[in-house]
A protein has these predicted regions:
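Glycine-rich phosphate-binding loop of ATP-dependent small-molecule kinases
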Residues: 1-240
């Protein structure tokens, strides 16, 4: 079976990390809308909720915000990743055991993975999640998930950061406006694919990037960068 084209000749897969409400979903929508419309994506949370509707034994985990067993989580990831390359999954890995499984999986398949980690203050998370008015987003569950994330996430990043042969890591500030987060993501992608001449050029004029309110990015810069990256991806696809 022929190997599928990589993202920018560099990555087989993207894993998106961070707390629920930190801006992961918005980043994915921007990626699909502006840059990678055909990227295969999945949220572990969405998959769990679908499965809990079919399997009562899983419903307790989603209702109480408890982590789903690692063997179930890793199995769901592996199944999705093998069928959808290049692709993206939101919410995996969430603890050290899952991170070790991801390392093993990447090594077995000779994959290079882009890790996108979004950090966000609890105040912003609460504001966003309660506005969603979803059943499993009540305040007690939000705090419980936040506590779990603070306890488990450092070990995940430690494991992945120790394997630069398999992973590239981008860290994003989810407290900022979603347009700024997306721009930061794109600039980091350009840096990682060694297009530093563009990355450095954008620092010349802040006015080129920021609108008059000084809080949001001029949409033209995101459209330009996405067009630029898409043209590279298309040329690479045509050569395969």
């Amino acid at each position: 079976m022929a190997r599928k084209p990589l993202l920018l000749e560099k990555w087989d897969f993207i894993v998106l990390l961070g707390e629920s409400g930190g801006g992961k979903g918005t980043l994915v929508r921007n990626m699909l809308g502006y840059w990678l419309p055909n990227l295969h994506t999945a949220s572990m949370g969405e998959v769990f909720r679908r499965k809990s509707a079919e399997d009562p034994s899983l419903k307790e985990y989603t209702e109480k915000g408890i982590l789903v067993p690692d063997d179930v989580t890793c199995g769901i990831f592996r199944e999705f990743a093998l069928a959808n390359t290049p692709g993206l999954i939101d919410g995996f890995p969430r603890n050290r055991k899952q991170a070790i499984d991801l390392i093993r999986f990447a090594k077995e398949n000779n994959w290079r993975v882009l890790v996108v980690d979004i950090y966000c203050d609890i105040e912003h998370i609460i504001q966003r999640l309660l506005a969603r008015k979803r059943e499993d987003d009540n305040l007690a569950i939000v705090y419980s998930r936040h506590k779990q994330h603070k306890e488990l996430h450092p070990a995940v990043m430690e494991e992945l950061a120790n394997r630069p042969d398999l992973f590239d890591v981008i860290r994003l500030n989810g407290n900022r406006h979603s347009e700024i987060v997306f721009t930061s993501f794109l600039l980091n992608v350009l840096r990682l694919v060694d297009m530093l001449y563009f990355y450095d050029m954008t620092n010349i004029s802040t006015d080129f990037l920021v609108n008059n309110d000084e809080t949001t990015i001029n949409p033209a810069i995101n459209r330009w960068m996405c067009s630029f990256l898409t043209s590279i991806q298309n040329k690479m696809n045509d050569s395969n």
